[in-house]
Amino acid sequence: MRRKTNIFWIIFSCSTLCFLSLIGVFLRIHQSKPTLASYSSAPVVIIDAGHGGMDGGAIGVDGQIEKEINLSIALKLDTMLRAYGFQTIMTRDSDVSIHSPDAKTVRQQKTSDLRNRLKLLEDTSSGILISIHQNKYSQSSAHGTQVFYGKNCPESKELAEMLQKTITGYLQPENTREIKQATKDIYILYQATKPAVMVECGFLSNAAEADKLTDEEYQDQIAFSICTALMNCLADQS
């Protein structure tokens, strides 16, 4: 009987120590995690789900449609940022183009759509834009996230660097792509006077990556990486 009692107390003690250790780990992680209250001034995050409506964007090797993937990731990111207390604005939260009513032709509608997205950023006090897109290339071997940034604001490059580092570190350790400054072909980033970045999450021309980009769990991981990168970048700047 005494032996059974000793064994019980040994098991109980070990279990208690393990439990306390887990609590300690949790508290260290929780305390080190950036919170909105730690930032000197929190931006209004404009989440831009690229394309929409009549503009489907890139089409994947198995028929995946870019605009749908963009919106799915953007909605997930919106939910995460709001959970952390951020104020967010989505350029679209459904399958629509946001062109002005007087735009009649497809060309006019696409141009108007881009201008309205840019205007939303420029009209938002303390606005910062994160645009979600997917890539496509003639060579199916091309893969990996790549982040582009606007040229008119130093914070854009800082955020792009943190995004690239976080996404590749968490999801794509083999990805050696580097961030790029946007050219005039990326209208919103090129014209923006406020912080603006575009996350090309992956290549729809790569069959394996296209499959991942349509996977809900992988989309959650992409959105989480973007959310984490933004918070870490703001913490560094504060």
Model regions and ranges:
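Catalytic-site microenvironment of enzymes
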Residues: M1-S238
